[in-house]
């Protein structure tokens, strides 16, 4: 048998045994030493996992939409569990550089340590949130493949539950979930046998996956950058056309501050790569003459922005003037996000606020999905 195929089969068997076999229970006490940094900048070790009645370890990914769904359940139950001797530790397992751009399309944040801090502040996490994305020590020891997933250990450090946090179609009934009932049983002092539930969520990205991310980045860098002339009629069509999903317009000139344009275009290019598979569209409109066309393309190529790129004369912008926010003392560059129905959303003159723009794009896409 092919050696590579044999290894794949053996890996699969190991996962199945771990998930299904009661004899495959693990103990916190048997885990190798680990040192994980929390968003509170404290270092957590195995000795911190010392709940009087048990310990709950939950692996979450910032970018995983299923993980995001269960944040409230964890936040709202944390104090109760802690006061009854159950410690909760949430851990982010992903190797950040292996995450593909479009895998971030359902989150306003990625999985870096700094973005974990932002998520903890944004959602008011009241539990320890630890980073294992760099070395993935505990992630590998527990054979974590999918987030979210929960490991519940009893007061003797024995694993008594592995599986999902709850049901995504029953978010308001978390108290009836298998995990919640197991925790209540531990609090009541009951002796429990190991059980598991089926996982669903987002695959964990490991350092070995970075080659895939690099290949994708290379393909992006090879995408053809084109620019075409637009008159007022065509530009107005793009602006007024009703769509299911939002679109972003960026108006600029070759006379704008070079660094400002570069940073704006790089930000827009990044978000276009993240959100375009969800239906997000980007239009860049350079106000300038045809003899500058090659220079325009060069600027866009440096930003790797393979969107709908247009150029036009200043006299063709009459119908687009209403998109410009009434701020600033110069005309360009300006940015405007428009909903599918034409409503004006995020807009600015000058530097793009990357966080505000991403939040606006994400919210608009989510709203559009809910209308489908």
Q: Which ranges hold each PLM region?
A:
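Bacterial N-terminal signal peptides
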Residues: 8-17
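Bacterial N-terminal signal peptides that target proteins for export
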Residues: 1-9
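Short, internal strand/loop/helix patches
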Residues: 109-147, 152-153, 159-160, 297-332, ...
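N-terminal, post-signal-peptide region of Sec/Tat-exported proteins
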Residues: 36, 42-89
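Short active-site neighborhood of thiol/selenol oxidoreductases, capturing the structured segment around
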Residues: 47-70, 183, 238-262, 268
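Non-globular targeting/processing and membrane-anchoring segments
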Residues: 22-55, 164-247, 360-372
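Thiol-based oxidoreductase modules, predominantly thioredoxin-like and allied folds used
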Residues: 85-110, 125-135, 279-293, 305-317
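Conserved helix-turn-beta segment immediately C-terminal to the redox Cys motif
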Residues: 69-92, 245-246, 262-286, 301
């Amino acid at each position: 048998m092919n050696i590579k195929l044999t290894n794949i089969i053996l890996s699969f068997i190991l996962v199945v045994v771990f998930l299904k076999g009661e004899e495959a229970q693990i103990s916190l006490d048997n885990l190798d030493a680990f040192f994980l940094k929390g968003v509170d900048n404290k270092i957590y070790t195995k000795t911190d996992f010392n709940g009087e009645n048990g310990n709950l370890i939950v692996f979450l990914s910032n970018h995983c939409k299923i993980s995001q769904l269960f944040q409230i359940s964890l936040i709202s139950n944390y104090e109760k569990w802690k006061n009854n001797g159950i410690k909760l530790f949430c851990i982010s397992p992903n190797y950040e550089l292996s995450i593909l751009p479009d895998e971030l399309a359902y989150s306003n944040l990625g999985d870096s340590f700094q973005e974990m801090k932002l998520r903890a502040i944004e959602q008011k996490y009241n539990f320890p949130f630890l980073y294992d994305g760099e070395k993935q020590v505990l992630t590998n020891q527990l054979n974590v493949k999918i987030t979210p997933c929960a490991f519940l250990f009893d007061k003797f450090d024995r694993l008594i539950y592995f599986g999902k946090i709850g049901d995504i179609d029953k978010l308001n009934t978390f108290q009836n979930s298998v995990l919640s009932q197991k925790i209540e049983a531990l609090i009541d002092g009951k002796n429990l046998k190991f059980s598991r539930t089926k996982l669903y969520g987002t695959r964990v990205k490991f350092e070995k996956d970075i080659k895939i991310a690099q290949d994708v980045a290379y393909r992006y860098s090879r995408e053809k950058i084109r620019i075409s002339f637009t008159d007022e009629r065509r530009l107005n069509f793009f602006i007024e056309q009703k769509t299911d999903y939002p679109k972003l317009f960026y108006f600029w000139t070759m006379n704008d501050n070079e660094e400002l344009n570069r940073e704006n275009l790089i930000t827009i290019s990044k978000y276009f790569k993240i959100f375009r598979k969800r239906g997000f569209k980007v239009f860049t409109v350079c106000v300038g003459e045809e003899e500058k066309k090659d220079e325009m393309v060069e600027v866009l190529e440096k930003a790797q922005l393979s969107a709908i790129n247009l150029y036009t004369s200043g006299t063709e912008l009459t119908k687009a003037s209403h998109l410009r926010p009434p701020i600033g003392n110069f005309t360009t560059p300006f940015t405007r996000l428009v909903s599918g129905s034409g409503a004006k959303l995020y807009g600015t003159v000058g530097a793009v606020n990357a966080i505000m723009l991403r939040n606006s794009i994400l919210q608009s896409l989510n709203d559009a999905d809910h209308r489908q």
